[in-house]
Amino acid sequence: MKKALAKIQKTEINTYIDEFVKARQKYFTDGQEWLEAKVTDEKIYVQIDRKQLEEELDDMIKISLQFGQVLPLEMKIQVHKVAGGAEISYMDNGAGSWRCGRIYAPEKAGRAASPEKRWGVQIA
């Protein structure tokens, strides 16, 4: 079996997250679940593997839907500019805080220091 290679590409992260959220909102039931994007007007360009980031965010949403245990379940994805890139935060209002997560998206592509960084995203 061949290992898939990461496809790192320059991406304006606020636009990407906004489009990601809009594409998924149609799958939620009104009054039961809601996904919201909190992005800025500032253009923040990062080097990411879009497919990997999409999978990580979808996994966080799936876990919230399975274990949130609250109605209405409100999920938020927020983008912050940080030194050297952007931080993508995910949170929900469900029971417990273990489903919350942060992903670092670097401004410049570089050599990975660890296997986790090879995908172009880091889960904190």
Task: List PLM regions with ranges.
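A short helix-and-adjacent loop within the catalytic ATP-binding
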Residues: 24-34
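Conserved polar catalytic motif of the HATPase_c/GHKL fold
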Residues: 58-63
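Conserved micro-motifs of the catalytic ATP-binding
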Residues: 2-6, 45-48
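Acidic ATP/Mg2+-coordinating residue in the GHKL
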Residues: 92
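Short beta-strand/loop element within the Bergerat-fold HATPase_c
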Residues: 74-84
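A residue-level detector for a conserved hydrophobic packing site
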Residues: 53-54
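A conserved beta-strand-to-alpha-helix junction within the catalytic ATP-binding
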Residues: 9-22
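Conserved catalytic submotifs in the C-terminal HATPase_c
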Residues: 34-44
